[in-house]
Amino acid sequence: MTVSSHRLELLSPARDAAIAREAILHGADAVYIGGPGFGARHNASNSLKDIAELVPFAHRYGAKIFVTLNTILHDDELEPAQRLITDLYQTGVDALIVQDMGILELDIPPIELHASTQCDIRTVEKAKFLSDVGFTQIVLARELNLEQIRAIHQATDATIEFFIHGALCVAYSGQCYISHAQTGRSANRGDCSQACRLPYTLKDDQGRVVSYEKHLLS
C-alpha cells in the first residue's frame, strides 16, 4: 500500500451551514461541522434543522457531511450524547468525528465513526487500535512528519486524514491542559481560552526582564 494508491479527499471546516455550502460549491469533497452539542468548538454549533437541510445539499454535489462530537464527555452526558447521535443519524450525515471512547459503549445506530485529532494519534499502535475497534477514518495528530504518516498509513486499513492548513497548537493534540489550569476552561471540553497565543513577559531568576510582551508560546 502506498500513499499514491488512494484518491485524495479535500475536507473543509465550517462554522455554520452557510460556510459549509460555500465550501462545497468551491470544491470541498467533505465538510466537518459542529452539531448542537459536544463539539470542540462550543461557539460553532448548528441545529439539527440546519444540518438536516445541509445534508441533501451536500449529497447533491457528491460531498459528505461529518459532524464533530469530539469532546470528553461527563458521565451524565452519555445518554444525551446517545440521543444526539441518533438524531444526527436520522438527518443523514455521513459520519461523526469523536474523541471520547465511551461512545463505543453506547447503543447507537450504524453510523461511521472517525477518530478526532483530539485522540492524539501519533503511533502505529494507537492507529491500529482505533481501526480495530471500528473507526473507519482517523485524523492524525498535527505534529507528525511524512515518515510517521506513511508508517501509520501502511499499518492500518482505516482512511487517514491529516491537517494541511490552519492553526497549529503548541501542545500535542488533545493533551494540552494550559487553559484548564489557568482559567478552568478545558480545551477537551470545547472551551479553550487559547492562553498559548497571548503575549507574556519572561523574567530570569533575578527578576530581570528577558523578553517583554512577546508571544513566547506560539
Task: Please identify what each model-predicted range represents.
Residues 115, 119-160:
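Internal, well-ordered domain-core segments that constitute the primary functional module
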Residues 2-121, 153-218:
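Active-site pocket-lining/capping segments in soluble small-molecule metabolic enzymes
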